Regions:
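Structured catalytic-domain cores with a bias toward divalent-metal coordination
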Residues: 1-245
């Protein structure tokens, strides 16, 4: 497989934030709200991204400033190593939103505008559901949950449209709230809202997503086969009916 598919692993984008136990980087900026892209629709208060103060979470940074060094590093890496490929998938792994495992795709900025490759994502979802009918993932646009300004994957996906290559960025939200029911005492620390905390539970969470990662690897390997099948017009109509009624 590795003779035909390249795998890049970026284990950590925000080391200072990880060290400090915060979403923000060392300058108080939330990297996932830092891209120069704005929602024209109503975003969730504060959590959708704001420019009020770095003392508040989800701070975007000052208007007109360059992106933060970590965000620039990620964008440069994607532009140089990923976007030139005829087909590429990204899985951005996040801990802590909801009780279910969720796979999100752009846009985070709009409930009204679907991405150009909607039918391709829909067919990828269909393949996953057919291959693993008993999986526990909710697969849908991020905008089904909330809207944000400055989403890095919205920005990078928009950049990818300048070429004919297909770039599908996915975000895995691991349903870590379920672990609160197992161990309510972990809420005594902020990390407990987003993290299983106990080592054996953390290992179980990580193991549970290996099937998804293997599926995405094989989907990338055979992309030409299923991309051709995803070109049917009725697939786009089905996707619109499901996600943008």
């Amino acid at each position: 497989i590795l003779q035909r598919v390249r795998i890049h692993v970026l284990p950590l984008i925000n080391p200072v934030g990880m060290l400090n136990g915060t979403r923000a980087n060392g300058r108080g900026v939330d990297l996932m709200r830092n891209a120069p892209i704005d929602s024209q629709e109503k975003t969730i208060l504060l959590a959708g991204g704001h420019r009020i103060s770095s003392y508040l979470p989800w701070y975007r940074g000052k208007a007109g400033e360059l992106m933060q060094p970590e965000a620039i590093a990620l964008c440069n890496f994607i532009a140089q190593e990923v976007l030139p490929a005829p087909f590429s998938l990204v899985l951005d792994c996040h801990s802590g939103f909801g009780f279910r495992n969720q796979i999100w795709f752009p846009y985070a900025r709009s409930r009204l505008e679907p991405i150009k490759h909607l039918k391709e994502v829909y067919y990828l979802r269909k393949l996953f559901m057919q291959t693993y009918p008993h999986q526990d993932y909710l697969f849908e646009p991020q905008s089904q949950h909330y809207l944000t300004h400055g989403d890095l994957w919205d920005f990078l996906y928009s950049q990818s449209l300048e070429s004919r290559n297909v770039f599908l960025p996915l975000t895995l939200e691991m349903g870590s709230w379920r672990w609160i029911r197992k161990n309510p005492l972990q809420l005594r620390q902020l990390l407990g809202l987003y993290h299983p905390i106990k080592p054996h539970r953390l290992n179980r969470v990580l193991r549970s997503h290996l099937i998804l990662m293997e599926f995405l690897l094989h989907a990338t390997l055979s992309y030409e086969n299923w991309l051709n099948k995803s070109d049917a017009q009725e697939l786009e109509q089905q996707a619109l009916a499901m996600w943008y009624p």
